[in-house]
């Protein structure tokens, strides 16, 4: 949306993501990313850690379930999202304001690690347009994937090998 402040942060999860469900059944995962800048000190010839930035993040629907299944405390991640300010009142009646990241995209950082990515397929209905549901298999069977095999001969409905566009 126009006017939103977009941020990308690279850091480590401080704890396992916490997965919850709204009364309407939408999944939401909450987690904190700690990002610590490193600077090279030429006088000492050593790398020094700067002051850590801790950002509270939330992600919704199917992506929330994927995060909860895939990421754990200490995972190095790349997060892109929008900064949102939220005000609330504590049980003691104190007014508080927090700034959080509403996550659009998240993935593991491959700078110091490797990852195997599996396309998630979830069964069941759900809200939000992402088709979120309860569980399901992590990877669909090849027979269910129309793009999982080479096209049959003559699939472009012509005798030549040219595509129809």
From Swiss-Prot:
GO cellular component, one term: nucleoid
One example of a Gene Ontology biological process annotation: DNA replication
Compositionally biased tracts (Gly residues): 123-137
Domain (SSB) ranges: 1-110
GO molecular function: single-stranded DNA binding
Keywords assigned: DNA-binding
Region of interest called Disordered, as start-end residue ranges on this chain: 117-165
Residue spans of biased composition, Low complexity class: 148-158
Database matches in SUPFAM superfamilies: Nucleic acid-binding proteins (SSF50249)
Domain of life where this protein originates: Bacteria
Family matches, as Pfam families: SSB
Signal peptide region: none
InterPro entries the UniProt entry points to: NA-bd_OB-fold (IPR012340), Primosome_PriB/ssb (IPR000424), ssDNA-bd (IPR011344)
Matching Gene3D superfamilies: Nucleic acid-binding proteins (2.40.50.140)
Subunit structure: Homotetramer. Interacts with RecA.
UniProt name for this protein: Single-stranded DNA-binding protein
């Amino acid at each position: 949306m126009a006017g939103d402040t977009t941020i990308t942060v690279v850091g480590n999860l401080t704890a396992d993501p916490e997965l919850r469900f709204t009364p309407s059944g939408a999944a939401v995962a909450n987690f904190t990313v700690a990002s610590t800048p490193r600077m090279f000190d030429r006088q000492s010839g050593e790398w020094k850690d700067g002051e850590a930035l801790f950002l509270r993040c939330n992600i919704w629907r199917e992506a929330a379930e994927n995060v909860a299944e895939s990421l754990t405390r200490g995972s190095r991640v790349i997060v892109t999202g929008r900064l949102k300010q939220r005000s609330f009142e504590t049980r003691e009646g104190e007014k508080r304001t927090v700034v959080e990241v509403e996550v659009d995209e998240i993935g593991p950082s491959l700078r110091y690690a490797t990852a195997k990515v599996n396309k998630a397929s979830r069964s069941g209905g759900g809200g939000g347009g992402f088709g979120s549901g309860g569980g399901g298999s992590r990877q669909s069977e090849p027979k269910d994937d129309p793009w999982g095999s080479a096209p049959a001969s003559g699939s472009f409905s012509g005798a030549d090998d040219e595509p129809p566009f």
